[in-house]
Amino acid sequence: MAATKHRASKPGPISPNSSTKVWLFSLLLTIQYGAQPLISKRFTRREVIVTSSVLACEVVKVVSAFILMAKDGTLKRLYKEWTLIDSLTASGLPAAIYALQNSLLQISYKNLDSLTFSMLNQTKLFFTALFTYIILGQRQSIQQIGALFLLIIAAILLSIGEGSSKASSTDSPDEILFYGIVPVLVASVLSGLASALCQWATQVKKHASYLMTVEMSVIGSLCLLASAHKSPDGTAIRQHGFFYGWTPLTLIPVTMNAVGGILVGLVTSYAGGVRKGFVIVSALLVTALLQFVFDGKPPSPYCLVAFPLVITSISIYQKYPYRLKKKD
């Protein structure tokens, strides 16, 4: 939880008990990430306004986090120890960075072909490792850096297999550079920075994962409401109502997405942003598997090539952590 009296210190090694939690949360998040596209496609009608489902997800996330805090006893201490400054320091900056990152990605995707976008977007894994070192002092071994290379290659292959073959929407090199390449690279840098800041807040400042989830959800919702004032979604909500196109089944993907948001916080808190990257890429394989099982869509050749790369990269990253060299 938010601890104003805790002294900042570098995160120590993961204990056996925490290691079990890391694997459990990572597995659950992988399944959630992998299943979310299919669940959303099956249970969310086209008429549903995107902003309404996102805001509903944030509400479910906040309520769930409060319930979990009440269960583990941190909610009682929240009233005495919570401060606005701590909240803005721990959650406000990452939330603002993520909002800017998403906007940059939307701009970039419209001006780049899928392959270029996927390749540049996956550099966020390296920037996460870089900022984790700068902010937290956590180093990567040579083997782990190699594992990150393998993971990025796998992510690119999976993105090619699942993505479209759309061409760039413009032939102007300057527009491709300034409205395509530059935005996605800046977004990757921001993604790595925000991930490292979240890890710093939970591991060093001892800001509780559940509390951080609540704070980032509230800040994100306020930003979304502000932007919806003049957006097409805002107009649609005013004309048709907040729950336009909803059915009782719409709550399934909304709730599942909220659970995923809580799991992201837990994985970042226990394992860090770099390992979260492994989870997200692994989830693409789960999506391909579920599409084959439920939709009869066979995995692409890219997916089959990427599978051993993901397994190998995870194995190497876990087996060869960075170790300080002993002085003679």
Language-model features, listed with the residues they occupy:
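Polytopic endomembrane small-metabolite transporters, centered on the Drug/Metabolite Transporter
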Residues: 1-328
